[in-house]
C-alpha cells in the first residue's frame, strides 16, 4: 500500500507553496532558537531586537522605533513593558513635542545589551556555519529587501494590477 501523499514526513520535505506561511514558520523557528540562547541573560529575542534598535537610533520616539521594527504602536508598547519594568529602558517626554515619548536605553539596559550581544554573536556564527556563509548573506539580503518599504509599495502595485 502506498503512503498517503500528505504524511508528515512528506509535508516536511515538500517546499511551502505560500511564501507568507514559509517566512512565518521560519521566523518562529529562528525566534525559538534565539529565545533559547538569550534565556541565560533573561531576555527574549524580540526584547534584544528592541534594545539594539534603541541603541542604533539613539532615544527614538515610539513611532520612529515602531517604524524601524515594522511593528504597530500597541505591539511595541506591549513589548516594551517588561523592559521598562526591569529598568532597561525608560520613556521620557520629547522636549520638542510634549505629547510624544522617547525611548531611552538606561545604564542597566546598556549593560544587558552588551551581555546579550555576546550571545547574539554566538548564535549568528552558529547560523552562518549551519546554513553556509554565502547562503546566510544572501538570505539576509533577501529578507532586508522583503522588509523594505520599497518592496511593500511594489507588491501593492503588482497586486492591484493583477485582474
Predicted regions and their residues:
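Short, locally clustered residues in the helix-turn-helix/winged-helix DNA-binding domain
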Residues: 24-27, 52-56, 117, 144
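Helix-turn-helix DNA-binding motif, specifically the short coil turn and the N-cap/start of the second
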Residues: 72-75
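The alpha-helix within a helix-turn-helix
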Residues: 66
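Central "turn" residue of the DNA-binding helix-turn-helix
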Residues: 58-59, 70
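C-terminal regulatory/oligomerization modules of transcriptional regulators
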Residues: 1-11, 133-163
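Residues that mark the N-terminal boundary/hinge immediately upstream of a DNA-recognition element
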Residues: 44-46, 61, 106
Amino acid at each position: 500500500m502506498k503512503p498517503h501523499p500528505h504524511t508528515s514526513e512528506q509535508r516536511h520535505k515538500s517546499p511551502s507553496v505560500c511564501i507568507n506561511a514559509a517566512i512565518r514558520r521560519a521566523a518562529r523557528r529562528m525566534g525559538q532558537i534565539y529565545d533559547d540562547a538569550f534565556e541565560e541573560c533573561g531576555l527574549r529575542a524580540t526584547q534584544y531586537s528592541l534594545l539594539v534598535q534603541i541603541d542604533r537610533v539613539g532615544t527614538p520616539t515610539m513611532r520612529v522605533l515602531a517604524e524601524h521594527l515594522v511593528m504597530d504602536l500597541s505591539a511595541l508598547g506591549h513589548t516594551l513593558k517588561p523592559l521598562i519594568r526591569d529598568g532597561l529602558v525608560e520613556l521620557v517626554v520629547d522636549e520638542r513635542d510634549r505629547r510624544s515619548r522617547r525611548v531611552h536605553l538606561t545604564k542597566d539596559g546598556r549593560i544587558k545589551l552588551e551581555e546579550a550581544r555576546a550571545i547574539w554573536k554566538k548564535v549568528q556564527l552558529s547560523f552562518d556555519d549551519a546554513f553556509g556563509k554565502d547562503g546566510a548573506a544572501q538570505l539576509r539580503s533577501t529578507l532586508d529587501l522583503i522588509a523594505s518599504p520599497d518592496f511593500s509599495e511594489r507588491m501593492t502595485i503588482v497586486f492591484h494590477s493583477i485582474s
